[in-house]
C-alpha cells in the first residue's frame, strides 16, 4: 500500500518540470506503431506524444510539438481514440479535445470543453463521439464537423466510458465515493439504468456485448480495505453476470479478444480470465520489475498481433518515463523512452 500512497501523493500534489525539448527531428508518418500520450505534470502544460515503430523498434518524442510549430499539446493528455485517419485526444487540463491526422499528428482542429469541464475519456460510436468530463457531464459531439451536439448531466465525476449494444456504459467514480455504472441509450441520449457496483469504478471496456468494469475500491490509508472488483455485465439486459474481487486497488487494464484482462494493481499486473472470471496469475509481472524507483506501473496496453504487453513506467513521476515491453509469460523484451507520466498507450496498425 505504500506504493499506492506514493502514487497518490505524487500525482496529486507535485508540480513537474517540462519534458526536455531538444532540437526537433523530422517526424516519419506512422505505419505499425505504438502511440503514447504522456500526461506531463499537473498544471505544467507539458503533455506530449511519443510514437514507437513496431517494425524498426525506434521511438520519436515530442511528436505533436514538433509538427505543429513547437506548440504544446496542453495540460494533461488523458485519452486517445483513433477513427479512420483522425485521432481524438482528451486534454483534460486544457479543456479541449485536440483533433489530429493520425499519420503525422498535425492539428486539424479542436473541440472546446470550457463550458463543460475537462474531457476525461472518449468513445466513438456511429460517427458520434462521447466524452466524460471533470464537471460530471457527458458531451456528445460530431466527429466530422467537430461540433458539440448535446450534453447530459451524470453522477459525480464520471471516468471510463464504452459502447455496446447501442448503449453507453459510464463508470461513475465520484472521486472514490461513486458506486455505479450509468447506462445511456445512444439514440435517445437518455439515462436508462444505473447499475450498482463496488466503490470507485474508473475503468471500463466492452468485448462484443459483454462489459467489464474495474472498481478500484477504497484505499487502506483512507480507512478502506484495498479490495477492488471486476464486474462483468451483459450489455443487452444491463444485468450483472458475475464479479471477481481483486486485491491491492486495481485500476487501469488492457484486454484481448479472448477476454483475457491484464489489470494494474499495487503489486503489478494481474492476469485474469474474463470468461471464467478467475485470476490466472495474481502477479504476472511485478511492479518492481517495471519500476525500481516508485514501484508503480502507470499504464498498460496490449498488442494483439504480437501478444505483447506494453507497460508505462513513470519512474518518480517527475522525470521522463519509459515503456517496458513484456511477453505473456512475464519476460521482458525491451524498453523505450517516453515523456513524463505515460498514461495512455494506443496501437495503430
Please give the residue ranges for each predicted region.
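Sec-dependent signal peptide recognition
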Residues: 2-8
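Predominantly soluble domains enriched in secretory-pathway, periplasmic, or organellar proteins
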Residues: 4, 19-349
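C-terminal motif of bacterial Sec signal peptides marking the signal peptidase cleavage site
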Residues: 14-17
Amino acid at each position: 500500500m505504500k506504493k499506492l500512497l506514493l502514487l497518490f501523493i505524487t500525482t496529486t500534489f507535485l508540480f513537474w518540470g517540462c519534458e526536455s525539448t531538444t532540437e526537433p527531428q523530422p517526424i516519419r508518418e506512422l505505419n505499425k506503431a505504438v502511440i503514447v500520450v504522456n500526461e506531463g505534470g499537473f498544471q505544467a502544460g507539458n503533455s506530449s506524444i511519443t510514437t514507437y515503430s513496431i517494425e524498426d523498434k525506434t521511438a520519436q518524442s515530442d511528436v505533436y510539438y514538433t509538427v505543429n510549430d513547437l506548440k504544446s499539446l496542453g495540460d494533461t493528455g488523458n485519452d486517445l481514440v483513433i477513427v479512420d485517419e483522425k485521432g481524438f485526444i482528451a486534454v483534460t487540463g486544457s479543456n479541449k479535445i485536440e483533433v489530429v491526422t493520425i499519420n503525422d499528428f498535425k492539428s486539424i482542429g479542436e473541440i472546446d470543453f470550457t463550458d463543460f469541464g475537462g474531457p476525461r475519456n472518449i468513445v466513438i460510436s456511429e460517427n458520434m463521439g462521447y466524452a466524460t468530463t471533470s464537471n460530471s457531464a457527458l458531451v456528445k459531439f460530431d466527429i466530422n464537423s467537430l461540433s458539440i451536439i448535446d450534453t447530459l448531466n451524470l453522477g459525480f465525476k464520471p471516468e471510463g466510458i464504452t459502447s455496446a449494444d447501442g448503449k453507453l456504459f459510464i463508470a461513475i467514480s465520484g472521486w472514490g465515493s461513486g458506486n455505479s455504472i450509468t447506462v445511456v441509450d445512444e439514440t435517445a441520449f437518455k439515462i436508462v439504468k444505473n447499475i450498482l457496483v463496488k466503490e470507485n469504478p474508473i475503468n471500463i471496456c466492452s468485448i462484443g456485448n459483454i462489459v467489464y468494469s474495474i472498481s478500484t475500491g477504497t484505499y487502506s490509508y483512507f480507512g478502506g480495505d484495498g479490495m477492488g472488483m471486476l464486474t462483468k455485465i451483459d450489455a443487452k439486459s444491463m444485468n450483472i453476470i458475475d464479479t471477481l474481487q481483486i486485491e491491492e486497488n486495481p485500476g487501469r487494464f488492457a484486454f484481448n479478444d479472448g477476454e483475457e484482462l491484464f489489470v494494474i494493481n499495487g503489486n503489478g499486473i494481474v492476469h485474469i480470465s474474463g470468461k471464467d472470471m478467475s485470476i490466472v496469475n495474481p502477479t504476472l509481472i511485478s511492479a518492481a520489475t517495471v519500476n525500481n524507483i516508485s514501484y508503480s506501473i502507470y499504464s498498460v496496453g496490449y498488442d494483439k498481433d504480437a501478444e505483447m504487453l506494453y507497460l508505462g513506467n513513470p519512474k518518480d513521476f517527475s522525470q521522463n518515463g519509459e515503456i517496458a515491453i513484456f511477453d505473456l509469460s512475464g519476460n521482458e523484451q525491451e524498453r523505450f523512452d517516453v515523456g513524463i507520466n505515460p498514461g495512455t498507450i494506443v496501437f495503430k496498425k
